Amino acid sequence: MLLAGLYFFLQPNLHAASGSSNVKFGIAPTSASARAMAHFKENFAWVQEVTWFNEPDNMYCVFHQGNMVNRVFYDEHGYWQYTLISYPPSSLTKTIKEKILNNFGGYKITYVNEIRSENYEPVYMISMENEDNIKIIRISGDDMQVKQDLKKG
């Protein structure tokens, strides 16, 4: 269930909404749950600008942290579900990077999506490619799976 509905958000070329609708603390959108706002303020107090989005069955917010795009998802009642962090390979931990490159020599990591949720270790969805192929790898703990393996051109 954690990965359900994430396909749209795992696209490497997806960018957050423009800064024109940024919301500062204390100016919560009227449709955003007070519970979600309280959780966000408690866990991301350092964030200065955030954009909120409301969907029929959930809400989420987007903010930037350096070269990372953070998306924090809440259910329709305002309870935190997971956080999706997208970033370039330069921000990937050395341990994860080595694990990938030791198993996929000749590939270059192109983009990372990290999914954090309560009671689970982070899940990494990593895009990588070589001259002929594109792969999407899923890493969770010691488990590594090829989720997509595509031929170029």
Where are these regions (language model features)?
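Bacterial Sec-dependent N-terminal signal peptides
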Residues: M1-S21
